[in-house]
């Protein structure tokens, strides 16, 4: 039996971008994809945009539209709806880098010992084609988690059994629920993972976790500290703030090497 991959998109009032996201999923060369959209009760034309794609997916798209308490409750809803062997999340204003991304990911999961894979994420301007930076997962190891460093979540795919075993996302977090889940995956469950040198997703810069200077400098660190504490993992403010110097280094590397224009 072919491996089914569930791609979950959480959306709220994204009529301007959600169609790009759905087209990106529809264009994938890997045929065994289940697309799940969890709408949080949009008041614009988001649901109408989603409904236009139901027939195009030929039974492979499921969606729900109802109010929720936040993004992580919505992500858990999508997880419960998923019937795939492997699960990944694609933000409602992001797209896959190319048509072959999921095919490459599926090939890696043919190795039964692999629990999860992740690659790289590209950032571009919200209303432009120029790429701003590349967030690579190549240097990640679980020992970096207490420093606030984690794999790029939009590039992360894991077996659904891992999510079930860990209990899914902790809805008490506003912006660090993915980090807290990674603490459980890598530090407690000790999942077997593989880094792929693959640009998985192109993100529009400005999501909830990097929208403002305050959230980057203060809000994120407060939640990261809380996540470590509830999981019994030692960290401190100095360790968490050191990640900003690492991020600056990544930006500098991006600025001094040739980069390019991304086109859909």
What is each stretch, according to the model?
Residues 1-213:
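Nucleotide-sugar donor-binding/catalytic module of glycosyltransferases
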Residues 54, 135, 211-217, 251-260:
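Short, charged low-complexity intrinsically disordered segments located at boundaries
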Residues 177, 220, 240-244:
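Short, conserved alpha-helical segments within structured domains
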Residues 198, 211-238:
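Catalytic core of nucleotide-sugar-dependent glycosyltransferases
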Residues 229-264:
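Membrane-proximal basic amphipathic "stem/tether" segments
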């Amino acid at each position: 039996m072919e491996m089914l991959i569930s791609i979950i998109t959480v959306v709220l009032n994204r009529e301007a971008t959600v169609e790009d996201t759905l087209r990106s999923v529809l264009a994938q060369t890997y045929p065994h994809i289940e697309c799940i959209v969890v709408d949080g009760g949009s008041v614009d034309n988001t649901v109408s945009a989603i409904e236009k794609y139901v027939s195009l997916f030929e039974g492979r798209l499921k969606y729900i539209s109802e109010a929720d308490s936040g993004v992580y409750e919505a992500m858990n809803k999508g997880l419960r709806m998923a019937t795939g062997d492997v699960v990944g999340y694609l933000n409602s204003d992001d797209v896959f880098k190319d048509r072959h991304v999921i095919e490459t990911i599926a090939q890696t999961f043919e190795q039964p010992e692999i629990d999860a894979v992740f690659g790289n994420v590209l950032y571009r301007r919200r209303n432009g084609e120029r790429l701003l930076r590349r967030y690579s997962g190549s240097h990640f190891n679980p020992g970096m988690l207490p420093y606030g460093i984690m794999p790029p979540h939009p590039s992360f795919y894991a077996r659904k059994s891992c999510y079930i075993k860990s209990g899914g996302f902790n809805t008490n977090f506003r912006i660090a629920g993915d980090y807290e889940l990674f603490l459980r995956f890598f530090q407690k469950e000790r999942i077997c993972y593989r880094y792929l040198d693959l640009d998985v997703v192109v993100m529009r810069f400005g999501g909830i976790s990097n929208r403002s200077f305050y959230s980057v400098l203060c809000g994120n660190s407060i939640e990261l500290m809380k996540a470590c504490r509830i999981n019994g993992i030692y960290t401190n403010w100095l360790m968490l703030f050191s990640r900003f110097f690492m991020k600056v280094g990544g930006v500098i590397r991006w600025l001094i090497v040739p980069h390019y224009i991304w086109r859909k």
